[in-house]
């Protein structure tokens, strides 16, 4: 009989950038099936829809994730002028002169992914998961795949650590994102207990802001033909 110690395999760990909205909650739900430890990180940047922080706290407890950190990054609010950081600026359906929505917060995802990378480094996590998407998105340049790949390269080189930024929703449309939540039997939770609305209305939202329009259009498409949308989701998933 051997007396040597058998080393226990290291636990797989992921850090999820978690706002409490539809996309990040869906990513969190999926991560819970794929990693031994799932750590959520939520950023308080003085956002217009501050209710999302409390929503994120509630969902983190409900889903029983390993840990949940809320980080104060209100300096971003001082630097970045946007409809999401200034109550006096109404959310517009029109693009600004630079071709971007006035809800774009410059540097937000650069800062979020940098801080999530530092947190992942300290935890010994191998992955950062974020719900950015290039298929159905609001025109934000920091939601593009090229940006994410550049950030991943910067983090790996800057910290000399193998670290992946995983974007499960990057090539999904909103209907497929709803299907993904349903695949894990969490469609009702995502629909009724997340906050995507720019005006801070939980669940189906205000129905008027761009975020609500995008969310509702995707839900309607999914509910009209669940079988077809689920099949398209399955077809989009990478094969082992």
Swiss-Prot record:
It catalyses: 7-carboxy-7-deazaguanine + NH4(+) + ATP = 7-cyano-7-deazaguanine + ADP + phosphate + H2O + H(+). ATP binds at residues 18-28. Binds 1 zinc ion per subunit. One of its GO terms (biological process) is queuosine biosynthetic process. GO terms for molecular function: ATP binding; ligase activity, forming carbon-nitrogen bonds; zinc ion binding. Gene3D superfamilies: HUPs (3.40.50.620). Its cofactor is Zn(2+). It comes from the Bacteria. Signal peptide: none annotated. Its EC number is 6.3.4.20. Keywords: ATP-binding, Ligase, Metal-binding, Nucleotide-binding, Queuosine biosynthesis, Zinc. It holds the Pfam family QueC. Pathway: Purine metabolism; 7-cyano-7-deazaguanine biosynthesis. InterPro entries: QueC (IPR018317), Rossmann-like_a/b/a_fold (IPR014729). It is an enzyme of class 6 (ligase). SUPFAM superfamilies: Adenine nucleotide alpha hydrolases-like (SSF52402). Zn(2+) binds at residues 197, 206, 209, 212. HAMAP family: QueC. Catalyzes the ATP-dependent conversion of 7-carboxy-7-deazaguanine (CDG) to 7-cyano-7-deazaguanine (preQ(0)). Belongs to the QueC family. This is 7-cyano-7-deazaguanine synthase. The gene is queC.
């Amino acid at each position: 009989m051997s007396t040597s110690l058998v080393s226990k395999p290291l636990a797989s760990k992921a850090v999820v950038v978690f706002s409490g909205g539809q996309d990040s909650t869906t990513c969190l739900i999926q991560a819970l099936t794929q990693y031994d430890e799932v750590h959520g990180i939520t950023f308080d940047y003085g956002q217009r829809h501050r209710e999302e922080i409390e929503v994120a706290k509630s969902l983190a407890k409900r889903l029983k994730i390993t840990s949940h950190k809320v980080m104060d990054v209100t300096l971003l609010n001082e630097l970045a002028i946007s409809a999401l950081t200034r109550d006096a600026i109404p959310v517009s359906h029109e693009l600004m002169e630079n071709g971007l929505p006035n809800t774009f917060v410059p540097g937000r995802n650069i800062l979020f992914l940098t801080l999530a990378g530092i947190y992942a480094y300290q935890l010994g996590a191998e992955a950062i998961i974020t719900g950015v998407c290039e298929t159905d998105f609001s025109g934000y340049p920091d939601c593009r795949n090229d940006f994410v790949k550049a950030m991943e390269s910067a983090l790996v080189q800057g910290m000399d650590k193998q670290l992946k930024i995983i974007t499960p929703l990057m090539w999904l449309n909103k209907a497929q994102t709803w299907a993904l939540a349903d695949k894990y039997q969490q469609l009702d939770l995502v629909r009724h207990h997340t906050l995507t609305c720019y005006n801070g209305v939980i669940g189906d939202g205000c129905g008027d802001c761009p975020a609500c329009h995008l969310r509702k259009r995707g839900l309607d498409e999914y509910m009209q033909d669940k079988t077809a949308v689920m099949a398209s989701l399955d077809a989009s998933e990478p094969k082992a």
